[in-house]
Curated annotation (Swiss-Prot):
Keywords linked to the UniProt accession: Chloroplast, Plastid, Ribonucleoprotein, Ribosomal protein
HAMAP family reported in the protein's UniProt record: Ribosomal_bL33
One Pfam family matching this protein: Ribosomal_L33
Subcellular location: Plastid, Chloroplast
One of the GO biological process terms: translation
Protein's recorded name: Large ribosomal subunit protein bL33c
Organism: Piper cenocladum (Ant piper)
């Protein structure tokens, strides 16, 4: 039986270094890396931060949760 609201929610993760650096001012393709994932509201009540690969920065960076 279902118990109220669903615990799992879909969240968007966005590269924090791309946003901070102003979308790479070099002659590379500009953009912001984003990932879609799920998190359990009961286990992680705060904002989610994961270390993922950013194709625009060409390295692993911290991706933070953003609002939809």
């Amino acid at each position: 039986m279902a118990k109220g609201k669903d615990a799992r929610v879909i969240v968007l993760l966005e590269c924090t270094s791309c946003v901070r650096n102003g979308f790479n001012k070099q002659k590379k393709p500009s953009g912001v890396s984003r990932y879609i994932t799920q998190r359990n509201r009961h286990n992680t009540p705060g904002r989610l931060e994961l270390r993922k690969f950013c194709p625009y920065c060409h390295k692993h960076t911290i991706h933070g949760e953003i609002k939809k």
